[in-house]
C-alpha cells in the first residue's frame, strides 16, 4: 500500500489490484503539471493495475505541446479510463477530457473550447495553424464534430474567445452522454425537508 501523501495527483492510498484508482488533474497544463501527472499515471498503469482509472479534471488549460503528451497517456492506456470534469475543462483541459474511454461532467461544470494562441504569434502563424489542426483532429475524432461545427465552436461568437459550454449544451452537442452528467445532490437539510413534505402530502 502507498500512502496518499507520497503523491500529488493520485487520490487516497492505492494497492496493487485495486478496483478503481482515482487521479486528479487540478492545474494549468504546463511542463511541471504534465510530467508529474504522467509519472503518477504511469505508476497506476504499470504497477497498481486497477480495473479502471478515474481522472478528475479541473483545469484552465495551457500548453498544447505539453498537454498532448498527457492526452496521449490517457488515450493509450491499456487500463479503461474515465475522465470527469468536476469544475472546468477549458482549452487544453477540454482535450484531456476527450482522452478518456468515457467522459463525464458535473451538472455545474463548464467546458470551454477555443483556438490556440501564443504571445507574439498571429493567428496565421504556422505553429498556431498546426496546433489548431491538431486540436481539431482530437475534437472531430473523439466527439464526432465535422469541420464546420468545430470551427464554429472554436471561433466562438463574434468578438469572443471561443465557446463556453455547460452540461446541458454538452449533451446537446454530443460531448457528454446525458447519463454521464453527474447530478448535484441537495444538502442534508433539504433532503430532510423534502422527505417531511412528502410524508405530509401523502397524509392529506
Predicted segments — roles?
Residues 1-92, 99-204:
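N-terminal organellar transit peptides
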Amino acid at each position: 500500500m502507498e500512502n496518499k501523501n507520497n503523491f500529488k495527483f493520485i487520490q487516497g492510498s492505492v494497492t496493487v489490484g485495486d478496483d478503481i484508482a482515482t487521479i486528479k488533474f487540478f492545474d494549468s497544463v504546463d511542463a511541471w503539471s504534465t510530467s508529474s501527472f504522467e509519472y503518477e499515471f504511469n505508476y497506476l498503469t504499470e504497477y497498481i493495475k486497477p480495473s479502471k482509472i478515474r481522472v478528475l479534471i479541473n483545469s484552465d488549460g495551457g500548453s498544447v505541446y505539453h498537454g498532448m503528451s498527457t492526452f496521449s497517456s490517457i488515450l493509450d492506456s491499456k487500463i479503461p479510463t474515465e475522465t470527469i470534469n468536476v469544475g472546468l475543462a477549458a482549452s487544453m483541459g477540454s482535450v484531456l477530457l476527450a482522452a478518456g474511454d468515457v467522459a463525464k461532467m458535473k451538472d455545474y461544470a463548464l467546458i470551454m473550447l477555443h483556438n490556440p494562441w501564443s504571445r507574439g504569434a498571429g493567428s496565421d502563424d504556422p505553429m498556431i495553424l498546426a496546433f489548431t489542426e491538431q486540436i481539431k483532429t482530437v475534437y472531430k475524432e473523439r466527439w464526432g464534430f465535422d469541420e464546420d461545427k468545430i470551427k464554429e465552436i472554436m471561433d466562438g461568437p463574434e468578438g469572443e474567445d471561443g465557446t463556453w459550454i455547460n452540461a446541458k449544451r454538452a449533451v446537446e452537442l454530443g460531448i457528454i452522454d446525458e447519463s454521464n452528467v453527474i447530478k448535484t445532490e441537495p444538502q442534508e437539510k433539504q433532503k430532510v425537508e423534502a422527505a417531511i413534505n412528502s410524508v405530509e402530502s401523502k397524509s392529506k
